[in-house]
Curated annotation (Swiss-Prot):
Entry-linked InterPro entries: 4Fe4S_Fe-S-bd, 4Fe4S_Fe_S_CS, NADH_quinone_OxRdtase_chainI
UniProt subunit comment: NDH-1 is composed of 13 different subunits. Subunits NuoA, H, J, K, L, M, N constitute the membrane sector of the complex.
Matches recorded under PROSITE patterns: 4FE4S_FER_1, 4FE4S_FER_2
One GO term of the biological process aspect: aerobic respiration
Pfam families, per the entry: Fer4_7
Residues annotated for [4Fe-4S] cluster 1 binding in this entry: C62, C65, C68, C111
Enzyme superclass (EC): translocase
Catalytic activity: a quinone + NADH + 5 H(+)(in) = a quinol + NAD(+) + 4 H(+)(out)
PANTHER family xref list: NADH DEHYDROGENASE [UBIQUINONE] IRON-SULFUR PROTEIN 8, MITOCHONDRIAL (PTHR10849:SF20), NADH DEHYDROGENASE UBIQUINONE IRON-SULFUR PROTEIN 8, MITOCHONDRIAL (PTHR10849)
Cysteine pairs bridged by disulfides in the record: none
Cofactor(s) required, per the database record: [4Fe-4S] cluster
Record-given protein name: NADH-quinone oxidoreductase subunit I
GO terms under cellular component: plasma membrane
Length: 182
């Protein structure tokens, strides 16, 4: 008999607690957003759409080193290297299959030139999977992205045809090793 009364009291308490919780939520700020009208807050380091950036000079930053494709755990990046007359490398084609991409950011970390950057854009829905394969023309943006002053060829000091050694940023003049001998 006491067990029966205890079960009734316990059940009534559970229902009252649930009703108080529902009533309390009626006066709180809503968690649901009306999406297109109200934008979702994204943290600063949110990893969304991948873009290819340009140098401050307007040239492509990508040097087709293939490190992004090697670092990608799902293999959604493919590219092929080509070379200009002055010896500068660039990707002949650069392709990302966003239907396979998991937006892990490893390609951005592996890129030595900061050409690949992840933006906070996440609206990439398509009706056909073929439309989720982005080519270089779709990925290139007009600006330098997160690092506006960085230029790989000036910082790295790589030899470019017609440019003397030691003329790059942070690069010293070549040392004549034979002059150091006694």
């Amino acid at each position: 008999m006491f067990k029966y009364i205890g079960d009734i009291v316990k059940g009534t308490g559970t229902q009252l607690r649930s009703m108080v919780m529902v009533f309390g939520h009626g006066f709180r700020k809503r968690d649901t957003l009306q999406y297109p009208e109200e934008q979702v807050y994204l943290p600063p380091r949110y990893r969304g759409r991948i873009v290819l950036t340009r140098d401050p000079d307007g040239e492509e930053r990508c040097v087709a080193c293939n490190l992004c494709a090697v670092a990608c755990p799902v293999g959604c990046i493919s590219l092929q290297k080509a070379e200009t007359e002055d010896g500068r490398w660039y990707p002949d084609f650069f392709r990302i299959n966003f239907s396979r991409c998991i937006f892990c950011g490893l390609c951005e970390e592996a890129c030595p030139t900061t050409a690949i950057q992840l933006t906070p854009d996440f609206e990439m829905a398509e009706f056909k999977r073929q439309d989720l394969v982005y080519e270089k023309e779709d990925l290139l943006i007009s600006g330098p992205g997160k690092n506006p002053d960085y230029n790989f060829y000036r910082v790295a000091g790589m030899a470019i045809g017609g440019k003397p050694k030691g003329s790059a940023q942070n690069e010293a003049e070549p040392i004549n090793v034979k002059s150091l001998l006694p």
